[in-house]
Amino acid sequence: VLPDEQIVERSADPARPDRIMQAITAPRMAVFRPATPGGAAVLIAPGGGYRHVVIDKEGFEMGRWLAARGVTAFVLFYRLPHQGWAAGPDVALADAQRAARLIRHGHTAYGIDPERISVMGFSAGGHVAASLATGYARAVYAPLDAADRLSARPDGAALIYPVISMRADLAHPGSRERLIGADPPPALELAYSPDGNVPADAPPFFLLHAEDDDVVPVGNAMAMREGLKARGIAVDTHLYAAGGHGFGISRAGSKPVAAWPEAWLAWARAQGLA
């Protein structure tokens, strides 16, 4: 933890931590390396409503699960757009682009195939991941070194109960306000809605949402699906009747949605991404 940053524990169960990081001052990644790397990597963007970044249930737990299956995982702690950064609403995308390029640049050291790097995002981190998978070519920061000559395009994208649309009738209100303000013009809403900005060479997508999600409406995943289909981009969509929001990899209990990591793994293997 750097000065001004804060980690808050939200769980009363020491065996089941649920920490968040607030006021991130320097973006960075936590790396989970498999005993025997299989060549695939996943950049993980946890959620937090653009208010904070979740550490455990959408970050470290997922990283450990992936590493146990031979996938090198990088959990991204990205800067938050409402905290005065010069990049404003592009700051998390800048951090995600930089992370993707650093992973690609360091592929030899990590035992990674540079063409097998995907991104996975949860909730507001789903917006970060979708923004990267659609806006990887946007120039949102000044190049720093040789890594920035590489592509930031992920080879696949998995969005788990994602924030997508910035339209007032569909958006998660807190994420929208912290990203683009309380009363943004329609052009700004569109510019920061990945479903309306899908390029022709976007990677394949995996979408997951519970229809009873009362935090981020399932319409967000459906809007992303429609945007991808309109551009001819491959997309696997998994909807579950029950699950709510924020269940991560291990907190859906006995509900059918608890099986989603295996569904993702099957999809990723079919894409050559796991």
Locate each region found by the language model.
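Short beta-strand element of the alpha/beta-hydrolase
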Residues: 39-47
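N-terminal cap/lid segment of alpha/beta-hydrolase-fold proteins
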Residues: 1-37
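Mobile cap/lid helix-loop segments that gate and shape the active-site cleft of serine hydrolases
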Residues: 3-5, 9-16, 146, 162-197, ...
